[in-house]
Amino acid sequence: MTEKLAGSEEYYSAIKELEIPTVIFGRVTAQMEVTSEPPFSGDAGEPLGKEAVHKAENAEGYTVVADTRGTLGWREGKADGRPLLILLSERVGQNYLRYLESKGISYIATGKERIDLARAAEILYSGFGVQRLGVEGGGTVNAGFLAAGLLDEISIILAPGIDARCGMRASFDGLPPGSEPVRLKLLSAKSFDDGALWLRYSL
């Protein structure tokens, strides 16, 4: 429903203008917007228990999905015209990794209980040539990158409308209650004819 508000077109044009060839989504956002397949229902197998990297394809950009335990199903190895690359924790089942390999999907498994985003960013840079990464949500993965100190800019499209449905998450969500707020510095503000605003901040 949110995409019915003015500002959705500006959102995608802003992404294009930012020239970010690699973007990352969280599991929930990916389930809604990236994959149409049902969740993985096979035997995931024994937990991996160690760091692992599989590069199925060289590319100038990737569609990255953070899926801690390996639950999403995939039809093929591409999404949005880019090769898929899945971030997982070391708790992922070994059979799920073989499933990804059979689909021609790259993956990075790092972090004992949850994905080690800082280490994953290092591997994305050194192993996959990713120099710029756009973090497109949802709120949990956005907050994870924020907490790990991996964001240098926040880009927000403010649409002239309100979505007040129960359960709709914020752009940043999931940090402990005692976490300090993060101060931002305005870089630019752009208005559109439909009333939408594009705000860019540095951290």
Segment roles from a protein language model:
Residues 1-203:
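Enzymes that bind and transform nitrogen-containing heteroaromatic metabolites
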